[in-house]
């Protein structure tokens, strides 16, 4: 009977660890585009990173999922241009090029909603740091 108790305690500890790890490191959630329908651009509006604290980090983290626990993919500074493709609970799913470029293939209508796979980068940032500037 003692072995069963040890096994049960070990198993419950392992399950608790796995649950904690799952909460601490959520899986990636691809940014989707085409949510505006087949007649409108894949992502709107064209936006800019603003409102960062110049005395602080002065960047916004781009994350793999719409949560602060999501893996950091990149850091964007003030003035960086991005496309907002999706919004989820205070997070903006964005697409952005290497510079203030277009050519990310989100500026035209697409026939159906799909996960963004390139050619530019994508991820999630806090919506409070993204300000629409066009579209």
Name each region found by the language model.
Residues 49-62:
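Short, basic/aromatic beta-hairpin or loop at an interaction surface
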Residues 20-24:
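Sec/Tat signal peptide C-region and signal peptidase I cleavage site
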Residues 79, 92-96:
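SH3/SH3-like beta-barrel fold
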Residues 8-18:
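Bacterial N-terminal signal peptides
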Residues 1-4:
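Positively charged n-region of N-terminal signal peptides that target proteins for export
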Residues 64-78, 86:
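SH3/SH3-like (including bacterial SH3b) beta-barrel domains
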Residues 25-46, 96-135:
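Boundary regions of SH3-family modules and the immediately adjacent low-complexity/disordered segments
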